Amino acid sequence: MKLWILGLGEFFQRYRNIWREIWKIRKQLDTPARQKDENEFLPRHLELIETPISKKPRLIAYLIMLFLFLAIVISIISKVEIVASATGKLVFSGHSKEIKPIENALVKDIFVKDGQFVEKGQLLLNLTALGCDADKQKTKVSLGLERLDGYRYKSLLYSIEHNRLPLLDFNQADFDSVQEEDKTGARHLITEQFETWQKQKYQKELAYQRKQAEKQTVLANIRKYESASRIEKEKLSDLKKLYDVKSISKHELLAQENRYVEASNELSVYQSHLKEVESDLLKAQEDLKLVTQLFKSDILEKLQQNIQREKQLTLELEKNEQRQLASIIRAPVSGTVQQLKTHTKGGVVTTAETLMVIAPEDDVLEVSALIQNKDVGFVEIGQEAVIKVETFPYTRYGYLYGKVKTITLDAIEHPQLGLVFNSIIEINKKTLTDGDKEIQLGSGMSVIAEIKTGERSVISFLLSPLEESITESLRER
């Protein structure tokens, strides 16, 4: 190994010495300097050899190399913006308000015209919903009748508690929709039902009183035969003593014993009858209570049903009133009337048909842009964007500048672009300039938003296809 190193050292030393000697005599090796006309008189081949090479090709070569070097340096140093293009349109932050009817209706009055400024709450249209007035009146009458029935039931309950009719007042506001004949009928019905209940109760009270009288009669007979039985028993005892001393005959004793047995049997019969009368009396008392309980239970059941029907009719009336209110269309916000589509009084409008659009006053103009699926991963909130309005060429009117405000988290299906993500971009102004003239932008104008997602050097941009090709070529498929 050492010999190899020594050999290489001697080899390079020899060439260094030779180069040094040649360098010393380098000027002697040059051709003698001649003038241009001297070179012209030389033979052709010598003229070509001796004539100095022109400096222009060398200068051009140097310039090309310089430009190439500068291009490489600039491509490394300079950066280009990476943008994600998104199509969209200008919208107001509060969005334009579409005015639509909730149902089919006839146009009764039109109070605005296209381009007119309206205040919030100002009357726009007056519609007539088909059958709304009739439905409301019908429901109102039905509700009044139900309230009248409810008042009748409550009056009867009061009558049951106090055993007399209350002072009936049918001039309340709840009964304004009820006709007088209905009120009179209700008054008569209350009186009739109360009197019927009173008669039934009176009949039961009479039956109860009869049973009480019968009970008193039975009690009197019981007391009578208790006394008679006691007396006959004492007589029988005395006669037994006389019979024992042979003072009376046996027939007299047996006759007295028979009278005692008869008195005892009559007493037993009336005592048994007393139990039956007491049972009948208890039943009569229950029947008397049952008349009131059944009448009250029937009234309470009907009152409960009446309350349910009244609630349903109240909701139905509110629904009809809401239909009437919905037919009177007012401006939801202050703004300008646009796209007015109905101009004929008496014309027909259909459910959810857009009658006009209200562009809100002093609302912020924004861009609603659709970001393609391939770009959404690089777009972030706060990134800057350049907005080009298709209506006005940017080469003449310039751009709008903005920042990404929001990005939806869920994609939506677009018929041309496929799955896209909706985003909102704030813009710095809502006008474009053409010389000294300012052009007002409006909602609905189509735009192209170029969102700046980053920067990239020019050299990497140029080499990326090569890098991609190399990467794919070195991979087994």
UniProtKB/Swiss-Prot annotation:
Which sequence ranges are listed under topological domain Periplasmic? 78-477
Q: Which GO terms describe its biological process?
A: killing of cells of another organism; protein secretion
Locate the transmembrane regions by residue number: 60-77
The record's Gene Ontology cellular component field reads: plasma membrane
Question: What keywords tag this UniProt record?
Answer: Cell inner membrane, Cell membrane, Cytolysis, Membrane, Transmembrane, Transmembrane helix, Transport
Consequence of substituting V376I: In strain: 405 / Serotype 8
Q: Which residues lie on this side of the membrane: Cytoplasmic?
A: 1-59
Q: What is the effect of changing R44A?
A: In strain: 405 / Serotype 8
**Superkingdom of the organism of origin:** Bacteria
Q: What is its main location?
A: membrane
Protein family according to the UniProt entry: Belongs to the membrane fusion protein (MFP) (TC 8.A.1) family.
Its biological purpose is as follows: Involved in the transport of the toxin RTX-III.
A further note on this protein reads:
The sequence shown is that of serotype 2.
| Protein name per the record | RTX-III toxin determinant D
Q: Which organism is it from?
A: Actinobacillus pleuropneumoniae (Haemophilus pleuropneumoniae)
User: What gene is it encoded by?
Assistant: apxIIID
